[in-house]
């Protein structure tokens, strides 16, 4: 099986810069997403707390879209492309790869103000990437954690979110 990014959080940068800080924020999201979605079963994916709510898989679809917006900002490309149909495994892989690529770009950037969210002719500064899709994705990862606990499949208790590692 192919090794996906974020089974552990990458080693932190040696210095604090806007780029390394934004990168680390995305790395934290990637690590949480990796372990939140690891070992999900069909019963977890279809779970929703009530008829009006999104299912776990619909929430994962939304997180995939958010990861694409984050990546597109770092690629300096417009948003609005439709995702192809994918299996859960493919969505998970694509989301993790999107986050990893965006993080790497930001980590080595001296000027993150060059990265903007582009919707048609409208450009929004990187601040909006932070309080928009990054914050929203973190929020929704928490929802999937709650949903999988409710469907009887809690996340691995050996995850150490502070250190970004798995306890032995």
Where are these regions (language model features)?
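Acidic/histidine-rich alpha-helical segments that form the ligand environment
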Residues: 87-141
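Bacterial Sec-dependent N-terminal signal peptides
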Residues: 1-5
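Short, low-complexity N-terminal intrinsically disordered segments enriched in polar/charged residues
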Residues: 7-23
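Short, contiguous alpha-helical
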Residues: 10-11, 24, 34, 45-81, ...
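Alpha-helical packing segments of well-folded alpha/beta enzyme cores
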Residues: 22-25, 29-36, 66, 91-105
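Surface-exposed helix-capping loop/turn segments at secondary-structure junctions
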Residues: 39-45, 106-114, 149-155
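Mid-length scaffold segments of soluble, non-membrane domains
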Residues: 62, 75-98
């Amino acid at each position: 099986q192919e090794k996906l990014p974020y089974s552990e959080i990458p080693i932190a940068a040696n210095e604090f810069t806007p780029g390394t800080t934004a990168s680390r924020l995305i790395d934290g999201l990637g690590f949480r997403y990796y372990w939140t979605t690891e070992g999900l079963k069909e019963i977890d994916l279809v779970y929703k707390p009530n008829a009006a709510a999104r299912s776990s898989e619909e929430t994962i679809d939304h997180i995939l879209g958010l990861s694409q917006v984050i990546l597109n900002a770092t690629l300096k490309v417009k948003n609005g492309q439709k995702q192809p149909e994918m299996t859960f495994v493919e969505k998970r892989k694509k989301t993790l790869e999107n986050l990893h690529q965006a993080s790497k770009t930001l980590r080595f950037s001296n000027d993150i103000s060059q990265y903007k969210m582009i919707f048609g002719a409208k450009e929004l500064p990187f601040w909006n990437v932070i309080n928009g899709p990054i914050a929203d994705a973190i929020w929704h990862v928490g929802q999937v954690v709650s949903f999988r606990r409710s469907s009887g499949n809690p996340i691995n208790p050996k995850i150490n979110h502070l250190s970004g590692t798995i306890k032995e």
